Regions:
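Helix-start (N-cap) detector for alpha-helical repeat units in TPR-like alpha-solenoids
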Residues: 48-49, 82-83, 116-117, 150-151, ...
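N-terminal leader/linker segments that initiate helical-solenoid repeat arrays
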Residues: 21-65, 69
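Position-specific recognition of the canonical hydrophobic site in helix A of tetratricopeptide repeat
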Residues: 59, 86, 93, 127, ...
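Structural signature of tandem alpha-helical TPR/SEL1-like repeats
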Residues: 27-36, 62-73, 94-107, 129-141, ...
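Terminal, low-structured helical/coil segments at or just beyond the last alpha-helical repeat
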Residues: 28, 196-231
């Protein structure tokens, strides 16, 4: 686990933080659910909830275009529907339509300016579009609005590392650790950067502090070994 996971996986993580389905199913069960909800839609008057649920099933089955089409139906009737804007942006990222994702996320933020997941998602989309400074500006604003979010600091640290702003990235990893002291992900990302910079003793101190905070030493064993080999 290192900070590169944020760039690759952040959209996936934040998109399902507020997922309107609260239970787990396997593929065949999702298909059964999709069949059932299609029947409900065919037999019922218009229901935004039914169409949002259908789109969610499409996404669980990785039917991204079907999901996009379903959210479009909702947005024709309710252009300011936050869930439809957010999840259509998410589906479009899987289709690599990053401009469309950006448009939906900007529209959502015009409606809900503090929407945390939308802000993080937009920062990732901007990076995919090669607009890293805009992405950094978005993360700076997000941290101002959500100063107690370890995830926001970690996302900014990852981008700062890509931009070779290593010292400020180290600060942000430290803040992420302070806000989520028992999360090993932030620890190993912090240590990984220290090792890249050749600061092996400092990396070991970070590991020792994490163990004192209650993170099992075994979870960090690989990183302890790396500090030994690189001294």
């Amino acid at each position: 686990m290192d900070c590169r996971l944020y760039r690759k996986g952040l959209i996936v993580c934040v998109a399902f933080l507020s997922q309107h389905l609260g239970y787990a199913q396997n593929g065949p069960n999702w298909r059964d659910s999709l069949t059932a909800i299609n029947k409900q839609i065919a037999e019922s008057a218009w229901s935004t909830d039914l169409h949002l649920r259908k789109a969610a099933y499409n996404m669980e089955l990785k039917q991204w275009q079907y999901a996009v089409d379903e959210y479009a139906l909702v947005l024709r009737r309710e252009p300011r529907n936050p869930a439809a804007l957010f999840y259509r942006a998410y589906a479009n990222t899987h289709l690599r339509r990053f401009d469309l994702s950006r448009n939906d996320l900007n529209d959502l933020l015009a409606i809900v300016p503090t929407h945390f997941e939308a802000r993080l998602s937009l920062s990732v989309v901007l990076q995919q579009l090669g607009r890293k400074q805009e992405a950094l500006d978005m993360l700076n604003q997000t941290i101002q609005l959500h100063q107690d979010s370890a995830v926001a600091y970690a996302a900014r640290a990852n981008l700062e590392r890509q931009l070779k702003q290593d010292e400020v990235a180290l600060y942000d990893w430290q803040r992420a650790e302070q806000l989520a002291p028992r999360d090993p992900t932030y620890v190993v990302s912090h240590v990984d950067l220290l090792l890249v910079l050749g600061r092996h003793r400092e990396a070991q101190r970070v590991l020792d502090a994490a163990v004192k905070r209650g993170i099992p030493r075994g979870m960090l064993a690989e990183w302890y070994e790396k500090t030994k080999h690189q001294k």
